[in-house]
Amino acid sequence: DMEWAIDRSGRVRWLQARPITQLPGDLNELDTSPDPSHVYTWCNIGEMMPGAVTPLTFSITGRGIDIGMQQSYRRAGVPVPQTEGLRYVGMYFGHLFLNLSTLSEISAHVAGSSKQQMCVAICGRDIEEIPEPARTSRLRRALSGSRYFYQLVSAARHRRDLDALVADLRVPSTGAPEAIYQAIDQNLHQVWKAYELHLLSSSSSGALSPILLGILAKGEDPSQEHHAEVAQMLAGAEGVESADIAEGAERIIDRLVEHPDASVRFSAADPTEAFEWLCSAESGPAGEELARYLERHGHRAVRELELRQQGWADDPSPLIVSLQSGLRARIRHGARPKPADRATDASEHPILRRLLPIAHAAIRCREHTKSGLVRVTTEFKRAYRGLGKAMADGGLLPDEDAVFFLTHEELGQRIGGRLELEEIAESRRRALDFQMPLHFPQLFRDRPEPLRLEAVEGEDGALLGKPVSRGTVTGRARVVETLEQAAALEAGEILIAPITDVGWTPYFNLIAGLATDVGSAVSHGAVVAREYGLPAVVNLRVATTRFQTGDLVTLDGNRGTLKLA
């Protein structure tokens, strides 16, 4: 590491030099081997798992997604070969990507499916770089099409099967490292099954969105207005599991407002002390409401399929901070008006009138099974954390957090005596900080290169994104890069964030609108924004760098734009 300066004459002067001791590990150490002819994307998977993942998460979540997709394709009649490798998921620089080329093979074997529908479901548009696969015989496609249709209408059964799996799953988290690892290993098939059932129950939701767009666009490329109209149609879904995360937080705040000591004992307290008070008998109905909330939603969190990330039941501090912000806003500004029913009248579209109830049911099913999948993941999070503690206590790892920086297979090898893995885990932990903020092209072949995102602008200089919840609002911007920064949100501000997953939901009762760099019509933020009647635009790419907190901005959820007011 050499430090230098240039003097007035232009001569270079060396100031000091020292050995570099904290270089990260290889950022591409665990990269998968790409097929140079295949097209990859971060769409969909980058919304579900934004940023880089730990090696353990790659070996469980990444593989779980891939196995779930393989099984759902086989059920639909696609002849997917048995393989130990990944077919539909890739990882580069620690980030997960989907292989659109292999995913498009469903259109070759299943009647009623097409490459275009698959691309619209994942990326919101057709991808011309992917050729339409050569199709098999009509008879074979018809038979597979009937199997695929049966799969779409069997979502309720898949939901029940996942509920039963969740109810029966128990993975030990204490004992000797060998015993914990063996218990985890013997139960991994439950993770693969959970992903399969979630993807099967979600398939109808993914299939219906491009169908609705196609009907509105009458076979042409869908416009911003078509995307906005579909978003308004989807807003009619009721009883969505993830929407209750925000509504449940509101119920806790309702009880806190009624408590005479809440402003001192909760709102102004340290988050740890506030949680302890809320769990005590002194908090009364507010504490009872929190207990019910954690029973239903305690497994949820930001980046909740990352095994290193604890749920709210195990680390309640992010939830408590959001409740404190909500209580302070309620005291200053009063309760937020309930959103009006914004569901569209589809009576002019006979086909849409029949499809909308099915689409709403599909959204409810997808969000319910996503919650079940996270419950399964949480059981393994706790087991792996227990394994990390046992390995650290036994001198096999430097600390329990290091467990997340070895793959599942490598953990077994470390228990078996492979010494160098301890140092490898430390190196990967340093690499994660370098991998996390990287951005990549939406589409690429071969290996991607990190890039600086470029804006897409409309005629008036406004940032152009995808409208996912209708309405227009003007207000002060709150630019938030991390969930921790969201604690500064004030009532009525427009939240501008890289992406919002379930961990951000408790703040939705504060904001007046939502703008994100990344997202789609079925991403979590879009679903909850529609339920709350919030204007929302996603896929703005550079909103978090273009705007600053305090800017007066106009968010147009009809046109899909964000600009200075």
Regions found by a protein language model. Give the residues of each.
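Extended active-site and interfacial segments that coordinate phosphate-rich ligands
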Residues: 15-68, 72, 81-85, 513-515, ...
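Acidic, glycine-rich flexible loop/linker segments
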Residues: 7-25, 477-484, 488, 492-493, ...
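Generic, ordered loop/turn and secondary-structure boundary motif
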Residues: 21-24, 41, 46, 50, ...
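Contiguous hydrophobic, helix-prone segments at protein termini
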Residues: 1, 9, 24, 38, ...
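Glycine-rich, flexible loop/turn motifs
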Residues: 41, 45, 393, 402, ...
